[in-house]
Amino acid sequence: MSQRVSDQAMAEVIAETRTNSSSRRHGGGDDTPSLPYMHKVGAPPKQTLFQEIKHSFNETFFPDKPFGNFKDQSGSRKFVLGLQYIFPILEWGRHYDLKKFRGDFIAGLTIASLCIPQDLAYAKLANLDPWYGLYSSFVAPLVYAFMGTSRDIAIGPVAVVSLLLGTLLSNEISNTKSHDYLRLAFTATFFAGVTQMLLGVCRLGFLIDFLSHAAIVGFMAGAAITIGLQQLKGLLGIKDFTKNSDIVSVMHSVWSNVHHGWNWETILIGLSFLIFLLITKYIAKKNKKLFWVSAISPMICVIVSTFFVYITRADKRGVTIVKHIKSGVNPSSANEIFFHGKYLGAGVRVGVVAGLVALTEAMAIGRTFAAMKDYSIDGNKEMVAMGTMNIVGSLTSCYVTTGSFSRSAVNYMAGCKTAVSNIVMAIVVLLTLLVITPLFKYTPNAVLASIIIAAVVNLVNIEAMVLLWKIDKFDFVACMGAFFGVIFKSVEIGLLIAVAISFAKILLQVTRPRTAVLGKLPGTSVYRNIQQYPKAEQIPGMLIIRVDSAIYFSNSNYIKERILRWLIDEGAQRTESELPEIQHLIVEMSPVTDIDTSGIHAFEELYKTLQKREVQLMLANPGPVVIEKLHASNLAELIGEDKIFLTVADAVATYGPKTAAF
């Protein structure tokens, strides 16, 4: 790194620095600077232990002050506000009118036409009978409409969570047709809801943010490909298909059945409707006004294919069909949940994982559409709403539900105004359960497979992956790790890799924070990173280091060693350039939001090491928390009060050469 000092003042600066620096050796504040600084670093008012704990608790769990409007209210008013807090529909419902209902009614009918065929297909991903998908789109949306805060999110089963649930449950009970498998699905749904509700009630929603965007992109893409590969069984009419989900096992199963297991009529039906679905998606993507074409196309596929199989009796020639679907509303499943026994632990494990993944997807969808309409959602209320609907769902024969991106997008484009669109959709699903389900008897499984493949195509976000590569290579590695983990091993392995890489990135950033050498921008008193601003000039006889992180036990030793390494490297370069040796080391602490006892100890060791090297340590702009701890630990006294400055410019003006001050 080359020394950046203006040429015209070089000789004068060197002479002055060598003359004056000998009288300014470090000494804990014994020397009197020639140019006093104008401002001292202020210390915050002293707080009691209780005040500190209260402040930290409120900032961690109640940063949005959710109960601020309860203050100074009567008891009856507080009761009303409490009900409105739990059930937001009681608040916005007061302003509901016919115009809003018109938009919600149209949107509800539109997403119902999309959700019914998807529900039949997604239930099969979870290794459940098709009617459980319909059950899940009846109860859960009703609960969410009363408790949720998003106007646009559409609730129901989704592909990724269905696949995750089916994979994890089949690992516990291989016979997916057994009654215990169904009971375990309800148990997992119950504990998924409990997990989500606890996160909301305890206001621990920030925990789901530990799964990075990059990991989610990779996981979703891998899950989409895995889901698509699983549908080859229905699309090709294969009866003897592997139970493994990795790409190697699936492709081996496909090719081993190529001569005897494929059914040409099934392939013709499946591919025809898949092409139709993809064409309608393309039309809707190119012309947003024609979104309804893509929305109703799955229902058209189900109706046309069912009629075709019925009149041709293709089921007699090897085309597999849905067969019987139960009619009627959801039966109670409260007695089916494992609250004890050998499957309780499995239900808790699967439920926690499925609940967190479902919650992550729902929050991402809710925030996306809220930003598009310029309103905000309450994350903790969303978690409570999601948890409640899954707990209630587990008691009414539903499996894990969450926000669906495809349905929410259609809901948004159809002009929904409030969550009432979910109520309209639920009513349509109820009518379907009561009246229409027998008509699905001849629906070919190949069409359901086509609907699933068309639905998950958009989950493979190539543009997002390319953007990750351009912006952050580590994020791209996280994305690819999750992606390959899903397609080559399993969904749970991919999810584990996604979480592990997300935590690894956090640990890497915490334990190895960035540091930078600062220089003065010509003609200003501003000091910036000399790598970012090549024209920035370093001050003769001084080294200015900025630490870009809080200083904790996990990184304090690294920061100390990195500062000393900067000192050695810069000192060697200045010696080679015959420039003044470094006599003052300034640590710019503006980005340092906090410091713990390990950080204090590291600075004490740094101070002692610099004393041996006859280099004077100075600090610039420590924040309120940091300066308070510096005084409490006596580190400020050790360094010297006159060595702690409000700005780098003050430190340079006080101890640097006069020509560098201006």
From Swiss-Prot:
The organism's place on the tree of life at top rank: Eukaryota
Keywords recorded for this protein, A-Z: Membrane, Transmembrane, Transmembrane helix, Transport
Localization, UniProt: Membrane
Signal sequence bounds: none
UniProt cross-references to CDD domains, sorted A to Z: STAS_SulP_like_sulfate_transporter
Entries under InterPro entries matching the protein: S04_transporter_CS (IPR018045), SLC26A/SulP_dom (IPR011547), SLC26A/SulP_fam (IPR001902), STAS_dom (IPR002645), STAS_dom_sf (IPR036513)
Domain named STAS: residues: 532-655
Transmembrane regions: 103-123, 128-148, 153-173, 182-202, 205-225, 264-284, 291-311, 346-366, 383-403, 420-440, 447-467, 481-501
Region (Disordered): 1-35
Record membrane topology: Multi-pass membrane protein
Molecular function as annotated in GO: secondary active sulfate transmembrane transporter activity
GO cellular component: membrane
Family annotation (Gene3D superfamilies): STAS domain
Function as written in the Swiss-Prot or TrEMBL entry: High-affinity H(+)/sulfate cotransporter that mediates the uptake of sulfate by plant roots from low concentrations of sulfate in the soil solution.
Family affiliation: Belongs to the SLC26A/SulP transporter (TC 2.A.53) family.
Name listed for the protein in its UniProt record: High affinity sulfate transporter 2
Species the sequence originates in: Stylosanthes hamata (Caribbean stylo)
Taxon lineage: Eukaryota, Viridiplantae, Streptophyta, Embryophyta, Tracheophyta
